[in-house]
Amino acid sequence: MTAEQSDLAWMHQAFIDVQTELSFKIQRANSSIGHSGAKGAVNEEHWLEIFRAYLPNRYEVASAFVIDSLGGRSHQIDLVVYDRHYTPTLLDQQSHRYVPAEAVYAVFECKPHLDKAYLQYAGEKAASVRRLHRTSVAITHAGGAYSPRAPFPIVAGILTARSSWADGIDDTFINHLPTEADELLDCGCALNDGAFDRFEGELKVRGADGALIHFLFRLLGKLQSLGTVTAIDWSAYASILDATKEEP
């Protein structure tokens, strides 16, 4: 084995170890915690830790509601990837965080396993975010102003420990993916069975070996391609105060 091959083998094993550790933590929570709500919260926190460790500091990750300037609000989302530097969260109360829709890059649901019901549920959660109104304003620079940009499509996915189908992420799984535009799942990871994404249009599936790191690196590439979120029209949010005064 050459030195280069040895280095690659070491790196490959390190990536596998990260996946094994997360899988063990989730398995331990599932076997030692009886209350389903508490179990879900612990597993959700494990996924949040992984995302915080591997995403660059320009991104913030949290469980949150997503809101818009028209008063719309999403379902509670297990894991929201949003802009860290340019967009403050609003109305934070303890663990209840509210993130402006314009700040959101991606949303994920954390579930015990992949099955038809959870895929549908994740799609509905994604739609509750994608249907929100997003503003965009011009950005001033030394030579004038950049025109307002159209918001990019928000990425949506699902995170689980395993697939409930015997063959993992197979044709049966694919046939149960949501098909409505607002409910589409762009990516997902089932630790013990593999990962998938359609960032380039065609659905790509990865087996269990290195699935977690493969998923994270593919997600990093997708987030990188989105660039920066649009500049928020804060006056639209300020107008909420006047709108409520006019109500009888």
Model-predicted segments: where are they?
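Intrinsically disordered, low-complexity Ser/Thr/Pro/Gly-rich regulatory segments
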Residues: M1-Q76, V81-P248
